[in-house]
From Swiss-Prot:
Protein name: Dipeptide permease D
NCBIfam families: PRK15462.1, yjdL_sub1_fam
Organism: Escherichia coli O157:H7
Periplasmic side: 35-48, 99-100, 159-166, 233-234, 290-311, 365-378, 434-461
Oligomeric and partner information: Monomer in solution. Exhibits a doughnut-like shape with a central, shallow depression and has a diameter of 8 nm.
């Protein structure tokens, strides 16, 4: 059989694991901001701070996770350990109604599991292809889109469980999903024998005071404890600063050690893509915070006599990603003609443009709410769907470029740095942006009145901010296109 005729068989086990990881992560994420404000009665500012701290630290730990996978564990073992930790974290989160301390501990455990899982699952997928394999981009688009099956089901299932039963039941479903994904992945273990395994030589060398696996176990226990303190003391911003400095230092070291100009050029492209990804996700991550509270407070959620739980709206974005992702992976064929860098920047411009359009629709929705008291459901659905479509032109493109780099032994670390900037820093910025909507007053009875004008202003500013990014990216695209054209003309002459 032609090796380029179809996707590798192992990809379907990775996709299955990704589906259930998305179910687990996004099921919990859909509930978290609502849990903090509606159940624990945090004010908006406090809720945004904890939510953005959690989402930021979730993307800090992939640097350590990528390092452990590159040097010790291998991508396969790192992914399995990460999935197990996330399942444990969701179980503990379900008990946070018993005592508030469980909230911080559970978020810390999930953060550690996510760090081992997130960057390394992409690298594991990259190991299934040769660097020049044309199926690579399609494989990443397929994984990204298929993973959103879990994102679609999770807010519906977890939102329904929370609404009809309890918050603990909603969070418990997220844990069940992660365990299911891990079991399926283990069933396909034989298809990953050619991927990198545990580096036993390194393990044997780390036996000072403790046996081989001792230090790894200490790390798995000590890291959640440390992150729990960061949440409790609200020191996460300091951890973010330290992680960013370390990440940029590692990136500079990789750049200096690059063997030729081609490798340095690839690194510069990755850095620039990461910057615009960071801005994109600072806008997109409003979906789990300010947009979620906007829907809860200002959108008419009645449909055929049933009030749709707010958490279920998180499925709209994922549904758009899945449908459009399958279309891009299997219907739209990637052209091998032309310059790859030019195509990359064209996709980024389209993604940022769609994000701007999505927030333009949300601005109209908020203005509708200001005039009539509540916004219409179809307008909200359209805005979230457009924003979901935009995602397909950002992360899959950047991740594919990272795994394509020809510097050995750095893909895990580079992916971790990408997650740090486009995830951790972006989520911190998203929290700062979301906090601009936390304007409220109290009436004579003591009830809280939330300001719709704050949402209008923030959504409108994001619309124009994303549009400005499109302008810059289009200039880069034009520069690269002209450069490629001039080079082609020079070769012809």
């Amino acid at each position: 059989m032609n090796k380029h005729a179809s996707q590798p068989r192992a990809i379907y086990y990775v996709v299955a694991l990704q589906i259930w990881e998305y179910f687990s992560f996004y099921g919990m994420r859909a509930l978290l901001i609502l849990y903090l404000t509606n159940q624990l009665k945090y004010n908006d500012t406090h809720a945004y701070e904890l939510f953005s701290a959690y989402c930021s630290l979730v993307y800090v730990t992939p640097i350590l996770g990528g390092f452990l996978a590159d040097k010790v564990l291998g991508n396969r073992m790192a992914v399995m350990l990460g999935a197990l930790l996330m399942a444990i974290g969701h179980v503990v989160l379900g008990a946070s109604e018993i005592h508030p301390s469980f909230l911080y501990l559970s978020l810390a455990i999930i953060v550690c599991g996510y760090g081992l899982f997130k960057s390394n699952v992409s690298c594991l997928l990259g190991e299934l292809y040769e660097p020049t394999d044309p199926r690579r981009d399609g494989g990443f688009s397929l994984m990204y889109a298929a993973g959103n099956v879990g994102s679609i089901i999770a807010p519906i299932a977890c939102g329904y469980a929370q609404e009809e039963y309890s918050w603990a039941m909603g969070f418990g479903l997220a844990a069940v999903g992660m365990i299911a994904g891990l079991v399926i992945f283990l069933c396909g273990n034989r298809h990953f024998t050619h991927t990198r395994g545990v580096n036993k030589k390194v393990l044997r060398a780390t036996n000072f005071l403790l046996p081989n696996w001792g230090w790894l176990l200490v790390l798995l226990v000590a890291t959640p404890a440390l992150i729990t303190v960061l949440f409790w003391k609200e020191w996460s911003v300091y951890a973010l600063i330290v992680a960013t400095i370390i990440g940029l230092g590692v990136l500079a070291k990789i750049y200096r050690k690059a063997e030729n100009q081609k490798q340095r050029k690839e690194l510069r492209l990755i850095v620039t893509l990461t910057f615009f990804s960071m801005l994109f996700w600072a806008f997109a991550q409003q979906g789990g915070s300010s947009i979620s509270l906007y829907i809860d407070r200002f959108v008419n959620r009645d449909m055929f006599g049933y009030t749709v739980p707010t958490a279920m709206f998180q499925s709209i974005n994922a549904f758009a990603v899945m449908l459009c992702g399958v279309f891009l992976a299997w219907v739209v064929k990637e052209s091998v003609a032309g310059n790859r860098t030019v195509r990359i920047w064209g996709k980024f411009a389209l993604g940022l443009g769609l994000m701007s359009a999505g927030f333009c629709i949300l601005t109209l929705s908020a203005r509708w709410s200001a005039m009539y008291g509540h916004s219409s459901l179809p307008l909200m659905v359209l805005g979230l769907a457009v924003m979901g479509f935009a995602e397909l032109f950002i992360d899959p493109v950047a991740m594919s470029q990272i795994t394509r780099i020809e510097i050995p032994g750095v893909t895990g670390v580079l992916t971790g740095i990408y997650m740090l900037l486009s995830g951790a820093i972006a989520n911190y910025l998203a929290g700062v942006i979301a906090d601009q909507t936390s304007q409220a007053s109290f009436d004579a009875s003591g009830a809280i009145n939330y300001s719709i004008n704050a949402y209008i202003e923030v959504f409108d500013q994001i619309t124009w901010g994303a549009l400005a990014c499109v302008g810059v990216v289009l200039m880069i695209w034009l520069y690269q296109a002209l450069k490629f054209r001039n080079r082609a003309l020079a070769l012809e002459s």
